[in-house]
């Protein structure tokens, strides 16, 4: 057990109940599930809860299109969502729906407390009304040009381009997303949450460490713009909860959606009487509450939600963790390219553990977008999980079963075991801080050491000699013990594999038992645990995704790239021989993560005419990069220098090893190359902006 048991409640954002889960959604649930499983592995009391977000005009309209009741539609979607999550080994302690009695009571309770405390204001407003459909239009059902940055095709409540929030009446050239008609103005009585009253509290909370630095900085911009009262009302017809004492008026979906965290936990408490709702949500609670969300809903979770809780007498979350978007093959998910992949389509073709590992290997605590490069995905899974991890057991377990009665030897030389155990605190810290990519690199570095040990010892040669039987027993037992430690470290990421390994070892894999002595312990016969990723299956998944997905919202329009004009003077010689490339938009450039790196070590690469192997320190992390600069630099000239590297370039498998990025250099090539060197004061890991 952990030395000091924590009480933790963790949530993922609620998926909307009008469509299927896709691989963009899965990033968040896998990220949260890994963190929750890690906490439980350490012996903490951790409850992972979620629910379907089941209210709003989109659900009402879609149910009408299908000719069924909204209740029937959301029940079917809930069933599909839960099955997808279960098949991806996402282990919720409770999965519920915002369309529940628990949530209705919680929403009413919070609203009435806010009202009684003076935080609900009522006023008549002019709102956009669809004259063709005879309905007031929710913010997300009005589209037009952003009043702040002038980006076209933006929703009526916030701009995806600049992040600004505004009233739908501020949109330029608004159109109804329901009928396409130009909306007209109509008066209606609405209730507003007095968000500006909480500005002081929110400024203190957002700078308390509850948010990532990037999020807190973004909120400062919103504070500078001034907080606005928040409209929490929608008019009938609407699918949701009616506001107490206000017939025909309904709670806006974003009021009762986050309350769904509380409603789901209420539901769990009813199933498990030993749990106390107030112990986790009461104002004086000492339990921990964490929300994992996407960066697109930061405003709601970091301003409205903590203010609502504070104003109604409940506790605020300890932290809100945001992540970036998922791209596929370097671009926005696309139906036409087959890269907008439903969770179920993936499951029809590939093992969910593959994606869990790949996402973990690329996740950090930052809000950067994550690219699912399908070629790199197959290569990394095959190299790390099949070639390194499972191969460690498959190469040695058979000898234990066939030659040593299935029993492990007492390991005489524990040097490797001690080295592996010495990494547990480092790996634990990475899991806790959501630096999963760093944890995976640490674990795979250990796997390389273990495989090198087996390759050097070659037990398959030892067993051919009578006088080396005990040595072979030692090597294979040592290798399997290292394998057990590695899989225990990976248990939060690969729960199904961990389960198979527990059956193989015939004992549970627990963090507290990492150093367990297995001398004389009997193992089960080894069975295949993981197959290689076959590219034909990846291609089949992409092909299926071209046919069976709903049309998604159009991407923001960008200007077509144009060729830059020729250099005006022949004296600009580099531009003549190497013209400037086509223009790209800022978003494409922003995807490149440039970092200051110190060249710790440089060395020649055997049988390579142009390459040097560089070990780069990027601030607490070391990367290996093969650079084609051998003709311009000798290794000793480079060591200790600072340079600039592309840090988020997908790792590339070369015949000399894995290259984990790219250093930047200028010049035509050969001996005429100059690496970029920043001025004094730059430090490894700094972002180049």
Curated annotation (Swiss-Prot):
Is required not only for elongation of protein synthesis but also for the initiation of all mRNA translation through initiator tRNA(fMet) aminoacylation. PROSITE patterns: AA_TRNA_LIGASE_I, TRBD. GO terms for biological process: methionyl-tRNA aminoacylation. GO terms for molecular function: ATP binding; metal ion binding; methionine-tRNA ligase activity; tRNA binding. It comes from Shewanella baltica (strain OS155 / ATCC BAA-1091). Residues 588-689 form the tRNA-binding domain. Its cofactor is Zn(2+). It comes from the Bacteria. Gene3D superfamilies: HUPs (3.40.50.620), Isoleucyl-tRNA Synthetase, Domain 1 (1.10.730.10), Methionyl-tRNA synthetase, Zn-domain (2.20.28.20), Nucleic acid-binding proteins (2.40.50.140). Its main location: cytoplasm. It is found in: Cytoplasm. Its EC number is 6.1.1.10. GO terms for cellular component: cytosol. Zn(2+) binds at residues 146, 149, 159, 162. This is Methionine--tRNA ligase. A motif ('KMSKS' region) lies at residues 332-336. A motif ('HIGH' region) lies at residues 15-25. The lineage of its organism: Bacteria, Pseudomonadati, Pseudomonadota, Gammaproteobacteria, Alteromonadales. PANTHER family: METHIONINE--TRNA LIGASE, METHIONINE--TRNA LIGASE, CYTOPLASMIC. Keywords: Aminoacyl-tRNA synthetase, ATP-binding, Cytoplasm, Ligase, Metal-binding, Nucleotide-binding, Protein biosynthesis, RNA-binding, tRNA-binding, Zinc. It catalyses: tRNA(Met) + L-methionine + ATP = L-methionyl-tRNA(Met) + AMP + diphosphate. ATP binds at residue 335. InterPro entries: aa-tRNA-synth_I_CS, Anticodon_Met, Met-tRNA-synth_bsu_C, Met-tRNA_ligase_1, Met-tRNA_synth, Methionyl/Leucyl_tRNA_Synth, MetRS_core, MetRS_Zn. HAMAP family: Met_tRNA_synth_type1.
